[in-house]
């Protein structure tokens, strides 16, 4: 009598129990802290939600970079006493004229020291500065990658929305948020760069003249809005004395008058700079500006060394929370433009789920009937293995929090057919051996061994295709690839391990005279 392999028994029991535990949250609420709580994460086409395609405005970023570079050049030229004129930023490049041709060589040294990737085109005493192609590509990739991470933090600040974020092309970002019922909220928080800066107010400027367009050199006019004064203007110094990148926390709060404010605190470096600014400018006003819009310009009454403060403004509780979220996530390196928008209602998702359930159930029942009709008791074992394979798939999807989409359901249904195909192949090989007149045990062992290589090859080639689909596909294609991969692994395990174990138990303990295959 052939002994049952204990490792197969233990492995099958452990895998099945573990799968039941992982799949349980899909059918009931689990309150135990020792058990998994995550159910299958449904995709946009099943839950409904928002679909946005974003364009990263790289030209604006590049123009800002050139403006910063121009300021750096002016400072270095002054320090090295290099005469120049007509220094302008035009079409993502810097153009200037050198007063003395002998200054071209030291000027190039300064440029190379600032950034060796800057290309200088010289025409007599005129110079055009621009980034090299490789530098532009590096900057573009950096900006898009930073934008993706900041969008993720803004959209999913609590870590519960599970958005899908993917880079498409050179400067497009695909954003899908399942279950999002308010696309306008998404557009609002993504439409703001959220660049927070602190400036000293130009106390000597004439507001009326500035509004007419006569703004002093080195200053700029910004507009504010509050409940008591309505719209108003303030002239501030262009120089940024402190940036929002030094913030560590930001949260909505209330002041002593129960007005909504945003409380913030700086990191160590920011606290030190903030302390120096407030210490050296007592009696002056410090403007807090967000995306070139004035939030507030309070008077500095004393040195603030603790590195924290509040931003007042015409805030509601909602707008204060929104601003705090934007500040925590950080400013976008470049503005984002929404070039495609789709909203999928939950009813459509529910219809898709219902259609997927019906298709899967009908397919499962049809396969079960066919297997029992064709292979009798062995067909029943194949059906049990198929049921366990579906359980394993559900458990793995829940465990890894893979997103299940409508194409993913199609992938699972496809693996059902592949699982049955493996069993059919095994049973046909067993049938061939029985026709040779060999014993039942020998026919079973030989049938599984001879079919194993074919099953492995077929599933490995499908796994390779699934891997390539996942690497090069986007959205629903990735969902199909994930479900197909999990389905193949589960179906192979159930067909080779579970089915063989069930047949061995049946043959050993019930000793059937015939397998019902001939």
From Swiss-Prot:
Source organism of this protein record: Rickettsia conorii (strain ATCC VR-613 / Malish 7)
UniProt keyword Transport, yes or no: yes
Domain of life: Bacteria
Function statement: Part of the Sec protein translocase complex. Interacts with the SecYEG preprotein conducting channel. SecDF uses the proton motive force (PMF) to complete protein translocation after the ATP-dependent function of SecA.
HAMAP family according to UniProt: SecD_B (MF_01463_B)
SUPFAM superfamilies (alphabetical): Multidrug efflux transporter AcrB transmembrane domain
InterPro entries referenced in this protein's UniProt entry, alphabetically: Acrflvin-R, SecD, SecD/SecF_arch_bac, SecD_1st, SecD_SecF_C, SecD_SecF_C_bact, SecDF_P1_head
Full protein name: Protein translocase subunit SecD
Gene3D superfamilies associated with the record: 3.30.1360.200, 3.30.70.3400, Multidrug efflux transporter AcrB transmembrane domain
Main localization, broad class: membrane
One MF annotation (Gene Ontology) recorded for this entry: protein-transporting ATPase activity
Keywords (A to Z) from UniProt: Cell inner membrane, Cell membrane, Membrane, Protein transport, Translocation, Transmembrane, Transmembrane helix, Transport
Similarity annotation: Belongs to the SecD/SecF family. SecD subfamily.
GO biological process entries: intracellular protein transmembrane transport; protein targeting; protein transport by the Sec complex
Subunit structure: Forms a complex with SecF. Part of the essential Sec protein translocation apparatus which comprises SecA, SecYEG and auxiliary proteins SecDF-YajC and YidC.
UniProt xrefs under Pfam families: SecD_1st (PF21760), SecD_SecF_C (PF02355), SecDF_P1_head (PF22599)
Location of this chain's protein in the cell: Cell inner membrane
GO cellular component, one term: plasma membrane
Bilayer topology term: Multi-pass membrane protein
Chain segments annotated as transmembrane: 9-29, 361-381, 384-404, 406-426, 452-474, 486-506
């Amino acid at each position: 009598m052939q002994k049952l392999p204990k490792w197969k028994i233990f492995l099958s029991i452990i895998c099945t129990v573990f799968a039941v535990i992982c799949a349980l949250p899909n059918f009931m609420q689990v309150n135990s802290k020792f058990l998994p709580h995550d159910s299958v994460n449904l995709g946009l086409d099943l839950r409904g939600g928002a679909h946005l395609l974003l364009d990263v405005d790289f030209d604006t970023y590049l123009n800002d970079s050139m403006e910063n570079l121009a300021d750096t050049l002016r400072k270095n030229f002054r320090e090295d006493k290099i005469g120049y004129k007509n220094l302008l930023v035009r079409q993502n490049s810097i153009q200037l004229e050198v007063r003395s041709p002998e200054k071209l060589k030291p000027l190039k040294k300064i440029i190379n020291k600032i950034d060796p990737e800057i290309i200088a085109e010289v025409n007599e005493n005129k110079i055009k500065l621009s980034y090299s192609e490789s530098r532009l590509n590096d900057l573009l990739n950096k900006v898009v990658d930073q934008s993706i991470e900041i969008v993720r933090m803004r959209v999913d600040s609590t870590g519960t929305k599970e958005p899908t974020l993917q880079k498409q092309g050179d400067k497009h970002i695909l954003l899908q948020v399942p279950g999002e019922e308010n696309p306008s909220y998404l557009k609002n928080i993504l439409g703001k760069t959220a660049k927070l800066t602190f400036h000293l107010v130009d106390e000597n400027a004439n507001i009326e003249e500035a509004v007419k367009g006569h703004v002093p050199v080195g200053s700029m006019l910004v507009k504010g809005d509050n409940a008591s004064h309505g719209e108003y203007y303030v002239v501030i110094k262009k120089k940024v004395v402190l940036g929002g990148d030094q913030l560590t926390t930001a949260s909505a709060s209330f002041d002593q008058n129960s007005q909504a404010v945003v409380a913030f605190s700086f990191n160590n470096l920011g606290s030190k700079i903030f302390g120096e600014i407030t210490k050296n400018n007592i009696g002056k006003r410090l403007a807090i500006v967000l995306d070139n819009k004035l939030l507030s310009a309070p008077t500095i009454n004393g040195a603030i060394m603790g590195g924290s403060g509040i931003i007042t403004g015409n805030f509601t509780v909602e707008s204060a929370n929104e601003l705090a979220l934007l500040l925590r996530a950080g400013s976008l390196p470049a503005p984002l433009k929404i070039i495609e928008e789709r909203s999928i209602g939950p009813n459509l998702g529910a219809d898709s789920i219902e259609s997927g359930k019906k298709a899967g159930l009908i397919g499962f029942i049809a396969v079960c009937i066919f297997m029992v009709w064709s292979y009798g008791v062995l067909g029943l074992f194949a059906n049990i293995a198929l049921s366990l394979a579906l359980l394993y798939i559900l458990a793995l999807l829940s465990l890894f929090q893979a997103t299940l989409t409508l194409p993913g359901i199609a992938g699972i249904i496809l693996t059902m057919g592949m699982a049955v195909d493996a069993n059919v192949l095994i049973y046909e090989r067993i049938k061939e051996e029985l026709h040779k007149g060999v014993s039942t045990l020998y026919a079973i062992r030989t049938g599984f061994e001879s079919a194993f290589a074919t099953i492995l090859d077929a599933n490995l080639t499908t796994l390779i295709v699934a891997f390539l689909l996942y690497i090069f596909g986007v959205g629903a294609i990735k969902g199909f690839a994930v479900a197909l991969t999990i389905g193949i692994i589960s179906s192979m395990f159930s067909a080779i391990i579970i089915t063989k174990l069930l047949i061995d138990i049946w043959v050993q303990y019930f000793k059937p005279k015939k397998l019902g295959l001939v």
